[in-house]
């Protein structure tokens, strides 16, 4: 087995099958949803899930058992598109055999020109982009075709947790990124609308709210800024986090709120992409490395125990060894707890795809490994400090067949623990060991009530 380290993915490329949900009894109709890509897509899939349930479909986990299959897709990197092509090939075969009746392609691929080719090649019945998913209502037989159709949402991890989208799109034009093309320019929801949704979710039992946006900290509405919204949500919700942020929008007040607000998870995901000022200019990121370092200093002061993660691209066209070494220095200076390290993937329609000075695959791989090893070294050292301590852990995913659950500390650390506690409960555990990406608890945690922990 190779000892080459691998970068952890932010979420699985294709979603894991969810527990089967039921539509109206007696309909006999079945549907399967597969989600590729970011948390925004996970949230969009929840909206579509409510549509199919409202239309009387029962959700199933396999294509073979489904009358209708919906692929909610990602277009950020070519390997994501390759995976979708593979799924479409399988679905095309099942349609020819009469085992699947209809296939819908939604999400970012649906908003790209390539969707026309995929539609004709694989016999896709419906293609939707990121701004017209409401049209799925008619596709599944709902008696409404109104753009305002907004199904009642449930938490995306069950009743205990929910994503709340506060804005869509992006106004930045990073050299490598296709998101503004397929998601459009930034559109922000009103503060009143967001708060109303949060209040409704909490009243229905949601305990953990995650605010979502392509550049979530860019949210602005009628004089309010993201820090105003975050503080308002934190005053209502028992537990709050947010993703994903852009350094150019990140205000000191927001960083301090992470540390000061008891209900905000002390975690910051702030993509830097490169530690080289020259490459940051080429990428059109809008900040310098020193400005990024200063923001991290504010965060570390506000939340000394908090977790910090980032995104880094290696092998962007024109990246030199000097640029790479500047990124390594920034990694050491910031001591990230984790990083999503990506080798540059050219996307048609982006500025970077047309640039020369291509970094060879072999060199990009070496730089990838060096960055990842530096990140993991820092992360492992920071996690080891937790060994022997006690943590209050929020259970995110209940125990598997082996009795092991996955939870999260208030500092944002992932924890593996043995417990019968249900998702949404808190458990007090001792940390016995650690890896670079996870803490491991003892075998006899004590379930604590939320009131007692508060």
What residue ranges belong to the model's regions?
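Proteins enriched for Cys/Gly/acidic motifs involved in redox and nucleic-acid/cofactor modification
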Residues: 1-218, 268, 290-301, 325-333, ...
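Short, solvent-exposed loop/turn segments at secondary-structure boundaries
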Residues: 80-82, 185-190, 220-224, 282-285, ...
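Conserved SAM/AdoMet-binding glycine-rich loop
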Residues: 101-105, 112-114, 203-322, 332
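Short, structured coil segments at secondary-structure junctions
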Residues: 120-124, 236, 410
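Short flexible coil/turn linkers enriched for glycine and charged/polar residues
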Residues: 156-160, 170-172, 264, 274, ...
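Hydrophobic, well-ordered secondary-structure elements that form the walls
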Residues: 270, 311, 331, 339, ...
